[in-house]
């Protein structure tokens, strides 16, 4: 057994006896971290999904960070939500939180910073006020008009960092505008089974970092 109840799943040993597999020790309430390492095509994904299938006896939510659509059929079979982050098959994402709350404003402030500034780049009070004013402005709009292309109109026209935002904007035909500049938001993580395919942006840190920031904010 483990602290969740019944053992996770059965394996047959070489002597044909039963091996009761767990990711936890008895009485251990810590997370059952595991690492699977083996050559390509050896069955890592199959084993992981088998473990997940058995773990559903305990309930809870699961999030699959996927590559090359490896888990899509599994997520679809269990009636989960599977998102593909790809400009040719884009899940429309609007990162601006729907409700104007203190917590949502704090997230949006940090998120906008991540779109404009490098992680080790310091900003001064003037730059901070530019972001705060833009957040005030976008929340003054009707909820259907809250997107990045409209948010940028609340920055000062001569702000020295304004041009850095263009890459994210459809209004500027930005290279990464497909990622976040949308009126709609289809990035709904309320299903108990979520799969997200990151194949297209795994090597694009400029897009990947803010996407992960948004993802973990919504999970929490």
Please report, for each region that a protein language model flagged, where it lies by residue.
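P-loop NTPase motor domains
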Residues: 1-19, 25, 69-72, 76-220
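Short coil/loop residues immediately preceding or within conserved phosphate-binding loops
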Residues: 31
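Hydrophobic anchor at the beta1->P-loop junction of P-loop NTPases
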Residues: 36
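Walker A (P-loop) phosphate-binding loop of P-loop NTPases
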Residues: 41
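Conserved lysine of the Walker
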Residues: 44
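Hydrophobic positions on the alpha1 helix immediately C-terminal to the Walker A/P-loop
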Residues: 47
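Post-Walker A helix-loop "phosphate-sensing" segment adjacent to the P-loop in P-loop NTPases
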Residues: 53-63, 78-81
């Amino acid at each position: 057994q483990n602290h969740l109840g019944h053992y996770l799943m059965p394996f047959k040993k070489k002597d044909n006896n039963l091996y009761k597999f767990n990711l936890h020790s008895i009485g251990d309430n810590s997370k059952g971290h595991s690492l699977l390492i083996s050559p390509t095509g050896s069955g890592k994904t199959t084993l992981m999904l088998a473990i997940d299938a058995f773990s559903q006896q305990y309930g809870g939510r699961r999030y699959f960070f996927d590559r090359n659509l490896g888990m899509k059929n599994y997520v679809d079979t269990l009636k989960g939500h599977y998102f593909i982050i790809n400009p040719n098959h884009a899940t429309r994402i609007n990162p601006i939180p729907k409700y104007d709350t203190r917590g949502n404003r704090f997230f949006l402030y940090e998120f906008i910073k991540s779109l404009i500034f490098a992680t080790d780049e310091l900003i001064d009070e003037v730059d901070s006020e530019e972001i705060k004013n833009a957040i005030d402005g976008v929340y003054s709009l009707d909820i259907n008009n809250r997107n990045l292309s409209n948010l940028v109109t609340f920055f000062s026209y001569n702000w020295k960092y304004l041009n850095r935002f263009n890459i994210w904007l459809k209004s500027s035909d930005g290279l990464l505008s497909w990622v976040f500049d949308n009126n709609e938001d289809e990035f709904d993580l309320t299903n108990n089974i979520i799969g997200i395919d990151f194949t297209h942006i795994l090597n694009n840190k400029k897009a990947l970092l803010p996407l992960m920031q948004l993802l973990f904010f919504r999970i929490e």
